[in-house]
Swiss-Prot record:
<comment type="similarity">
    <text>Belongs to the TACO1 family.</text>
</comment>
<dbReference type="Pfam" id="PF20772">
    <property type="entry name" value="TACO1_YebC_N"/>
</dbReference>
<dbReference type="InterPro" id="IPR049083">
    <property type="entry name" value="TACO1_YebC_N"/>
</dbReference>
<dbReference type="InterPro" id="IPR017856">
    <property type="entry name" value="Integrase-like_N"/>
</dbReference>
<keyword id="KW-0805">Transcription regulation</keyword>
<dbReference type="GO" id="GO:0006355">
    <property type="term" value="P:regulation of DNA-templated transcription"/>
</dbReference>
<keyword id="KW-0963">Cytoplasm</keyword>
<dbReference type="InterPro" id="IPR026564">
    <property type="entry name" value="Transcrip_reg_TACO1-like_dom3"/>
</dbReference>
<dbReference type="InterPro" id="IPR029072">
    <property type="entry name" value="YebC-like"/>
</dbReference>
<protein>
    <recommendedName>
        <fullName>Probable transcriptional regulatory protein Fjoh_2560</fullName>
    </recommendedName>
</protein>
<dbReference type="GO" id="GO:0003677">
    <property type="term" value="F:DNA binding"/>
</dbReference>
<dbReference type="Pfam" id="PF01709">
    <property type="entry name" value="Transcrip_reg"/>
</dbReference>
<keyword id="KW-0804">Transcription</keyword>
<dbReference type="InterPro" id="IPR048300">
    <property type="entry name" value="TACO1_YebC-like_2nd/3rd_dom"/>
</dbReference>
<dbReference type="GO" id="GO:0005829">
    <property type="term" value="C:cytosol"/>
</dbReference>
<keyword id="KW-0238">DNA-binding</keyword>
<dbReference type="InterPro" id="IPR002876">
    <property type="entry name" value="Transcrip_reg_TACO1-like"/>
</dbReference>
Length: 237
């Protein structure tokens, strides 16, 4: 198995915050998708993907429909996606994806978390190159052979296809999302969820005490409502 498999296995044992936080993230994704491509999921592939993710997270249908309606209102503020980079203690690179309606607030908050936890906020491009930006899809098994599917999807950008207890996972470079989504839909395969992840190219092993130092910063960052995802180069068991 490749790095995507190991990455997924490691993160699975860790976080995904409380359900309320997950719903907040999906709500922001809906706003950004609607503002970008309109409220009709049939004509908006990004919104279609977010709705699939909402279903996978057991977000009530009424909540999704209400969020789409609110996002369609021109008075509803859009969110700007901002990427922050820096270092946690012990040389661990940190990459933070945010979606904010107030850039100044988000910058100040992220900077304060680094300062309070003995980290260092970096400049643009300081650690992003240490991560591979990927897209992923989870589809229903339905008797599908993962190895055969991988061979069939190589021309659409697929790099790694593997099975777990919840379905079949497909990983590809970030830029292959549209082509893969279209091909999976054309094949009539049920997409359970999809998204983007940044996979560290190299990870660093730490002692238990050092891990606690890094986790303190990560947890502080993840508590912020503007934060969507946090990635790092610390090795996870």
């Amino acid at each position: 198995m490749g790095r995507a498999f190991e990455f997924r296995k490691g993160r699975k044992m860790k976080r995904w915050s409380a359900m309320a936080k997950t719903f907040t993230r999906i709500g922001k994704d809906i706003v950004m998708a609607v503002k970008e491509g309109g409220p009709n999921p049939d004509a908006n592939s990004r919104l279609r993907a977010v709705i699939q993710n909402a279903k996978a997270a057991n977000m009530p249908k009424d909540n999704v429909e209400r969020a789409i309606k609110n996002a369609s209102n021109k008075d509803t503020a859009n969110y700007k996606e901002i990427l922050f980079e820096g270092y946690a203690p012990h040389g661990i690179a940190i990459l933070i994806e945010t979606a904010s309606d107030n850039n100044n607030r988000t910058v100040a908050n992220i900077r304060s978390y680094f300062n309070k936890c003995n980290g260092t906020m970096g400049t643009q491009g300081s650690v992003e190159f240490m991560f591979d930006h990927t897209c992923n899809f989870r589809i229903a098994k339905d008797g599908i052979d993962a190895e055969e599917l991988e061979l069939e999807l190589i021309d659409f950008g697929a790099e790694e296809v593997f099975e777990d207890e919840d379905g079949i996972l497909i990983y590809a470079p970030f830029g292959s999302f549209g082509a893969l989504q279209k091909e999976l839909e054309n094949r009539g395969l049920e997409i359970l969820s999809s998204g983007f992840e940044r996979i560290p190219q190299i990870t660093k092993e730490l002692t238990e005490a050092q891990i606690a130092d890094v986790e303190k910063l990560i947890e502080k960052i993840e508590e912020d409502d503007d934060v969507m995802n946090v990635y790092h180069t610390m090795k996870e068991e």
